[in-house]
Amino acid sequence: MDHADLACIDLDLPSREGFRKFISSWLYRGDGFTVLVDPGPLSTVPWLCRELRRLGVERLDHILLTHIHIDHAGGTGALLREFPGAAVICHPEGIRHLVAPEKLWEGSRKVLGALAEAYGEIVPVPAERIGFAETIGPAGIRAFLTPGHAQHHCCYLLGDLLFAGEVAGVRCDVPGGIFMRPATPPRFVLEVALDSLDRMIALAPRRMVFAHYGVVETPLQHLRIARNQLLLWVRGVAETAAIEPARREEALVAWLLERDEQYRNECRLPQDIRARERYFLGNTLRGMMEYVDALSDGERQALGEMRPA
């Protein structure tokens, strides 16, 4: 495929500190076929529509959702009003939550608080406009169920380009390297996340789009870093399990900063983006802690002995 047919549309939130170069929507235009990946939250739909019009987009054939979290899919229903010919592709587990999003919105408000309000309420998607397909459109886009970040997560392969969503976590460019961290909110299961990563590695993509953030030319390197990070971070959670709850997160962060080169690059992030990442870190660690703390003593000990490749 011709990667010149790709365009990134940044969906910044000026009202929130550090919410720049974080949320993005990706546009692909082939021969008579137009696809948008992750339209973002409701509050950025007006900007997204202006950018699509500026780029000369008159119709969307498909809207592909990597998952249904509010910052990726919350604006889908509103976007359909502007592009009534589009069909939405979503993980089968996520469809009902977008058709009737009341519980999804309630959960988003509970977890994110004021940030959910900044994203905007989730607009329902008509049931006849949303579904799942393993192969999409004349470009032959392939959809893969990749639970881990969420049970309703999908990745999409367009030629040799992988739209990875958050299967490999979050990344940012920093001077002289990259910052990366896992994205493992509660209901995280290590084995499930590793299986999804292994299947994406087996596809051997040549380019990869992170939902957060950017396109990379070394996807296998990034996928392997993400896999090693999961193993390392879960080991850290296991090794700090005996520390009192009030001190555990602080101790775990110190443990990680000593051992994880990519996470240690947090210090190279701009101050506002660093604050944003610290905000989301708590949810990542909670997901891992809930997973590890539910294991038996023997299982936790085995995790403590695991080493990344």
Indicate where each model-derived feature is located.
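Active-site/pore-lining binding-face segments in mid-to-C-terminal subdomains
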Residues: 197-255
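Active-site neighborhood of phospho(di)ester-bond hydrolases with catalytic His/Asp-centered motifs
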Residues: 37-40, 61-68, 89-91, 146-148, ...
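A short, structured active-site edge motif that brings together acidic residues
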Residues: 89-101
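Active-site metal-binding motif and surrounding structural segment of the metallo-beta-lactamase
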Residues: 45-90
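Metallo-beta-lactamase
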Residues: 98-145, 151-220
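C-terminal regulatory/interaction regions
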Residues: 239-309
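Conserved beta-strand hairpin/beta-sheet module of binuclear metal-dependent hydrolase folds
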Residues: 1-55, 59, 156-166
